[in-house]
């Protein structure tokens, strides 16, 4: 199959291929190295110009765990805003709150919602289904405490990328 790329993008792809013509398969990269690369990618996403009225870190406690979360409220948000529970991607093995900070800010601003990003426990340090259990526990807590979080209880969505 032949794909016609934009000339600027084609130049970037050609440069990347020439720099490393035989990249390793992701399964062959040690997890620590893979995680470090993922973190570096996240740092390339600037948050300049994406100013939410409120951004704070807290945690949600359940019977089984403590789930770190980050809450984003856009400027001018209504007293009780719609909510988005954001679950980051990374195959339940990589990722954290910082990697999707820019995206969560953008979602809060452009969709006029309060975003609550979850930072679940990662495998293989925590056996499956620990990450899923973290997300379920945090979601249940958020739904039960919507008023305290200034959320409209009937307008809370769940989203994310990849594993999220």
Can you say where each PLM-predicted feature lies in the sequence?
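Active-site glycine-rich loops that stabilize anionic/oxyanionic intermediates
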Residues: 81, 88-93
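Proline/glycine-enriched tight loop/beta-turn segments at coil->beta junctions
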Residues: 65-67, 74-84
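Short amphipathic alpha-helix adjacent to the substrate-entry channel of hydrolases
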Residues: 98-118
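Short beta-to-alpha linker loops that shape the active-site pocket of alpha/beta-hydrolase fold enzymes
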Residues: 119-123
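Short strand-loop-helix active-site module centered on a catalytic nucleophile
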Residues: 69, 85, 107, 118, ...
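Conserved catalytic-core motifs of eukaryotic protein kinase domains, centered on the activation segment
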Residues: 96-98, 126-128
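A glycine/proline-hinged amphipathic helix-loop "lid/cap" segment
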Residues: 1-71
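Short glycine/serine/threonine/alanine-rich loop segments
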Residues: 40, 113, 151
């Amino acid at each position: 199959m032949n794909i016609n790329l934009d000339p600027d993008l084609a130049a970037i792809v050609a440069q990347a291929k020439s720099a490393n013509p035989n990249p390793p398969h992701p399964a062959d990269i040690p997890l620590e190295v893979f995680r470090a690369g993922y973190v570096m990618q996240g740092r390339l996403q600037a948050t300049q110009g994406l100013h939410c009225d409120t951004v704070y870190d807290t945690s949600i406690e359940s019977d089984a765990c403590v789930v770190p979360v980050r809450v984003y409220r856009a400027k001018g948000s209504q007293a009780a805003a719609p909510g988005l529970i954001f679950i980051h991607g990374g195959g339940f093995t990589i990722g954290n709150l910082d990697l999707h900070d820019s995206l969560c800010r953008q979602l809060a601003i452009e969709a006029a919602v309060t975003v609550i990003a979850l930072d679940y426990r990662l495998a293989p340090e925590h056996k499956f289904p620990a990450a899923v259990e973290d997300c379920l526990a945090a979601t249940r807590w958020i739904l039960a405490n919507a008023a305290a979080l200034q959320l409209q209880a009937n307008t809370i969505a769940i989203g994310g990328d990849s594993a999220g």
